[in-house]
Structure formats: C-alpha cells, structure tokens
Swiss-Prot record:
Residues 1-22 form the signal peptide. The RxLR-dEER motif acts to carry the protein into the host cell cytoplasm through binding to cell surface phosphatidylinositol-3-phosphate. Keywords: Host cytoplasm, Host nucleus, Secreted, Signal, Virulence. The keyword Protein biosynthesis does not apply. Its main location: secreted. Belongs to the RxLR effector family. This is Secreted RxLR effector protein 2.
Length: 115
C-alpha cells in the first residue's frame, strides 16, 4: 500500500492538471466566439481644429472601429479554434485513460487488505 501511495498521488495530480488545461482551452474557445480578434480592431487618428482665438491648436481624436474580417483572417481564426479543439480532445482522451487505469487497477487494490 505504501509503495502505491506515491503513484496514486501522481495519477491524481496528472488528472487535475489535465482537467485544468481542458477547462482553460474550452474557456479560450468560448471567448473567441464572443469577442472579435484583436487584429480586427484598428485605431484611426484624426485632427480637427478647435475654434478659438488661435486656430493653431488641434484636438487629437482616436476612434476605434471594427475592420471587416477578410477570408484569410476567418481561416486563421477557424484554424486556431480547430487546434484548440484538438488539444482539448487529446487532454480529454488522456484524462479518460488515467481514470480508467485508476478505476480498474488501483482503486480495487486499495480496498483489499493483505494477509
């Protein structure tokens, strides 16, 4: 039992790490569906004169506007989402594998008492 305790701790740590990574990837995918990519935002700077005694002063205005996504931008966003989904699937598969090992081999042996 003492020999298997470190193995169980390592297995539980790996399961927890995979779960956290899978949730992080899923959160990133959800965020990319609701927010526009940063590259699609541009800043336009314009100057307009202030009506005053001296017309030499100008006011700088920054306006952020959305740029229409081109075909390549859309493909890049979809490729990023596909790679994130692929990573999430791999993490999920590994998590199921670890849980099956834990359920099949380690948990039944923990309950048994040796002679």
């Amino acid at each position: 039992m003492i020999c298997r305790s470190p193995l169980i701790v390592v297995m539980l740590f790996v399961i927890a790490a995979h779960t956290v990574l899978a949730l992080e990837i899923a959160t990133r995918i959800d965020a990319s569906e609701t927010e526009s990519p940063v590259s699609a935002q541009m800043t336009r700077v314009s100057y307009r004169p202030i009506t005053s005694v001296d017309n030499k002063r100008f006011l700088r205005q920054e306006t952020t506007f959305e740029k229409k996504l081109g075909v390549n931008d859309v493909h890049a966003v979809h490729a990023e989402e596909r790679s994130a989904l692929g990573k999430a699937k791999i993490l999920g598969r590994d998590l199921l594998w670890f849980m099956s090992i834990l359920g099949r081999f380690l948990i039944p042996r923990i309950g048994r008492r040796g002679p």
